[in-house]
């Protein structure tokens, strides 16, 4: 592998979980900078057609439970491995403990696959859920006290993959992604569900919207991910966000002004939950 003065010269990257908002934005970001991409897609995924193959983008069908097959499927090897793939990211599945435990195994399998592919660098996608409830600006030095299975598994995956990478002499970078919005965002996210309801002239029901939230556009998140692949420091955790938090109500008001001014937003219709995060 070739190195440049400021970091790795990335020629080819592997991405698991590439069909979401960040994954697709990262594909575009890497290709725009001359990096070939291998997108690892679940067999039978309804979102597989989002991956537009070309001379620069190759699609490989492989389930998270079979990542050990990747070295056979990607004969050309790679330099950087982005592991975004994760089962159970919404609703009750976040507290499916056996399912979340499997995600930790899959993350370790991803390290094994990355090593077999000759990757110098492994970058994992963690979450703000690793912190639990915290009143203040999030950064890598804030203690992590996750309160659901999803956050616990993400924290564990980050720590275990770091040790696994160290054992193999690979650079390890863990990201804690705050709130991302953009094209191909999940239908269950606050931004997308609010937009859909407003476009259908339905009243969105919300909390009071006093939570302080940090939103980042997916294209900007992808830029951060590319730069981490090139220049990120081994062993560090990076929070991926804009660095500026605003009351959630402000974001929702902006959506309302642009999507449908004639619909009243139902602020306060939904009470805060017992484990409500008020600062993200």
Which sequence ranges carry the predicted segments?
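N-terminal Rossmann NAD(P)H-binding glycine-rich loop of SDR-like oxidoreductase domains
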Residues: 13-33
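SDR active-site strand-loop-helix element
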Residues: 16, 40, 81-87, 122-128, ...
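NAD(P)H-binding glycine-rich loop region in Rossmannoid oxidoreductase-like domains
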Residues: 61-102
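Active-site helix of classical SDR
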Residues: 149, 153-156
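C-terminal substrate-binding subdomain of Rossmann-fold SDR/epimerase-dehydratase oxidoreductases
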Residues: 202, 206-280
């Amino acid at each position: 592998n070739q190195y440049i003065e400021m970091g790795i010269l990335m020629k080819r990257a592997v991405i698991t979980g590439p069909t979401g908002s960040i994954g697709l934005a990262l594909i575009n970001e890497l290709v725009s900078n001359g990096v070939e991409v291998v997108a690892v897609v679940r067999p039978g995924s309804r979102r597989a057609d989002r991956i537009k193959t070309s001379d620069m983008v190759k699609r490989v069908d492989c389930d998270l439970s079979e990542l050990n097959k990747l070295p056979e499927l990607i004969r050309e090897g790679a330099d950087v491995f982005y592991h975004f793939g994760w089962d159970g990211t919404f609703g009750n599945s976040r507290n499916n403990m056996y399912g979340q435990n499997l995600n930790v195994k899959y993350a370790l399998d991803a390290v094994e696959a990355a090593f077999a592919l000759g990757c110098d660098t492994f970058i994992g996608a963690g979450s703000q859920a690793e912190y639990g409830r915290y009143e203040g600006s999030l950064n890598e030095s804030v203690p992590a006290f996750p309160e659901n299975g999803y956050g616990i598994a993400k924290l564990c995956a980050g720590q275990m993959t770091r040790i696994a990478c160290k054992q193999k002499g690979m650079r390890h970078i863990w990201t804690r992604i705050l709130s991302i919005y953009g094209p191909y965002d999940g239908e269950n996210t606050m931004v997308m569900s609010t937009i859909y309801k407003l476009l259908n002239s339905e009243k969105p029901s919300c909390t009071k919207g006093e939570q302080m939230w940090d939103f980042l556009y997916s294209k900007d998140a992808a830029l951060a991910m590319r730069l981490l692949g090139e220049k990120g420091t081994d062993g560090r955790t990076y929070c991926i966000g804009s660095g500026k938090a605003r009351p959630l109500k402000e974001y929702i008001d902006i959506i309302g002004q642009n999507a449908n001014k004639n619909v009243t937003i139902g602020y306060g219709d939904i009470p805060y939950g017992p484990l409500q995060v008020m600062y993200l």
